[in-house]
Amino acid sequence: MEALYPKLISADLIVLSSPVYWFTLSAQAKLFIDRWYALESPQDSALRGKDFALVLAYGDTDPYTSGGINAIHTFQDMCRYLRGNIVGIVYGSASNLGDVQKQPELMERAYELGKKAGAAVP
């Protein structure tokens, strides 16, 4: 993480991506976020006010029964705590290679998030 902290601090936009495992973000994604604690002080956070985006994939067809909505709420709570700006969230059902490409509406949402992300970066 020592190599990543300066990159996180200098980033204009932080995009998190995770599969949904056991009804929330993957353990690896959550561990990555948990380690941001090292960037906190009693007065402030080095990530306060950053722009964030989230991309999720889950196996079920429903964001509620898959736990995708739990992952989204975790992300929203994190951004609220950091006083961050949510640039966008893209989520959808995808279990196998190529599943996303078969969903034009999901591809369009991902494309639009990319445009928003590009606009958020000075």
Each language-model region and where it sits:
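Glycine-rich phosphate/pyrophosphate-binding loop and the adjoining helix
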Residues: 75-122
